[in-house]
Amino acid sequence: MMWEQFKKEKLRGYLEAKNQRKVDFDIVELLDLINSFDDFVTLSSCSGRIAVVDLEKPGDKASSLFLGKWHEGVEVSEVAEAALRSRKVAWLIQYPPIIHVACRNIGAAKLLMNAANTAGFRRSGVISLSNYVVEIASLERIELPVAEKGLMLVDDAYLSYVVRWANEKLLKGKEKLGRLQEALESLQRENAYCSD
């Protein structure tokens, strides 16, 4: 499939998701910027979040249930309230931002990876040579069990401690997204970007 047609189809899906408010509101401006480049199109994204997830065992997505999720900071009381609703094991998880971007060619992929690395996304790279998909990701993550079958496994002081760290790590990821946006805006302004 030709790049232009591929990008057009992916943009259609993105715009539909954006109109249905399925795209994290705090990352829309960055995604629009990425999509404004001729040689990039976003495939999926998450601006980072904190969640309480009920799981039978770690990694078991099929039976998982979100008991609470927040894309901005969260209060200890909100996490505790969500965890107490667990029927299995409630995990407090702080997810870092992640964006998948298809690029027209390897040169465009390298340019995007350089901008991502400059912004602090050190764990970014090409994850597929088909459409040169770049994963922009970082390592800010917390994942630990906090309750089981409605009973807290940790005391209030420890829960307060990890929620504070989760909020700080979430903010750090959001700051990186801001730096990525600045790097791409600078690239656009300098007219340094050209397709080969």
Curated annotation (Swiss-Prot):
It holds the Pfam family TYW3. Its EC number is 2.1.1.282. The keyword Transferase applies. Keywords: Methyltransferase, S-adenosyl-L-methionine, Transferase, tRNA processing. One of its GO terms (biological process) is tRNA methylation. InterPro entries: Taw3, tRNA_yW-synthesising, tRNA_yW-synthesising-like_sf. Gene3D superfamilies: tRNA wybutosine-synthesizing-like. This is tRNA(Phe) 7-((3-amino-3-carboxypropyl)-4-demethylwyosine(37)-N(4))-methyltransferase.
